[in-house]
Amino acid sequence: MEKEDAGAVQCGTGEGEAVVLNERSEQCSAFASIAGCDEAVAQCFLAENDWDMERAINSFFEPGVESALQNKAAADIADPLKQETMSGTASDSCIDLTGDDLVVTKSEATTSNSSTVKQEDESHFSFLTWNIDGLDESNVAERARGVCSYLALYSPDVVFLQEVIPPYYEYLKKRAVSYTIITGNEDEYFTAMMLKKSRVKLISQEIVPYPSTVMMRNLLVANVNISGNSICLMTSHLESTKDHSKERLKQLDIVLKKMMDAPPLATVIFGGDTNLRDQEVAKIGGMPNNILDVWDFLGKPEHCRYTWDTKVNKNLRAPYICRLRFDRIFFRASQEGSQVIPQSLYLAGTEKLDCGRFPSDHWGLLCDFAIIL
């Protein structure tokens, strides 16, 4: 990955720890040179194999789930989605991704948000939503490894994913053993939630259908407890393309009603690929009074205005420039008790992989929430 300049290594407090971290950084460089991969990917394989170089190399080249990813043809999945990308109208064995021995080999963590790589803090939790573009079969295995590298780097407590395909799901189950993963479906393509086992207790889950979707879309809901707080999590991938605006707004209405109907003592967080254009939100009169768009709430930060940006992200090789805020996070506060408040918002996935492409045609949104008693 290449967005920032120097490599940054997470420093320990003693000389011995510093030596170990330096040795591991050198191992990452050596592994990356041998395997022809990113150093962040190298770190993942070394960590899962107890920093044994030979075992890690063997694991990297082991056939298995990645072969399924490589061989999966997405051409027969969701024709409307393929039209969106072309029309110009749209816009390894297990690894614990929350391990304490994370070596940060790029400086994105310190440049974009120094709080993203940290020990668990009960007064905060982190959240990532990302359309990972599983329908694009090009470089899908390397892009999947890239997504897992970001999960290892940021170690978010909650992850929402859109455009997950079955081989990608199997890959995540194999790699992200520190998360409970639930999905909105298990066929063709779907949404998923990843809940860090050490922080998030899953209470219940629900799939809310969209009656008139033609793209297999739905709303995935999970009621969880984080640090003693009841939180209702929701993710969705709303209907794609400009031509399906009417259906998209129907789906948005279902989402907003579901958020408003959640128990009053619960905090509600929705995140996903909404495919919304600003004029569509204006058309319905804006957001309900008790539901906030986190980007608006945080002062409309320019650095994360666009999450689908063909000016910078050339994955689609689009012959046009289109910069839109498709990916959004909505928030409804609880009416009593401790409050969960959005604190910061950053883009994820903005570094190219060695294949010359980004992990997805979308940027991810990484949000930090404070828990105020």
From Swiss-Prot:
Main location: nucleus
GO MF entries: 5'-tyrosyl-DNA phosphodiesterase activity; magnesium ion binding; manganese ion binding; nuclease activity; single-stranded DNA binding
Active site: 273
Localization of this protein: Nucleus; Nucleus, PML body
Pfam family, one: UBA_4
Cofactor: Mg(2+); Mn(2+)
Sequence similarity: Belongs to the CCR4/nocturin family. TTRAP/TDP2 subfamily.
Protein's name according to its UniProt entry: Tyrosyl-DNA phosphodiesterase 2
Taxonomic lineage: Eukaryota, Metazoa, Chordata, Craniata, Vertebrata
Name of the gene encoding the protein in the UniProt record: tdp2
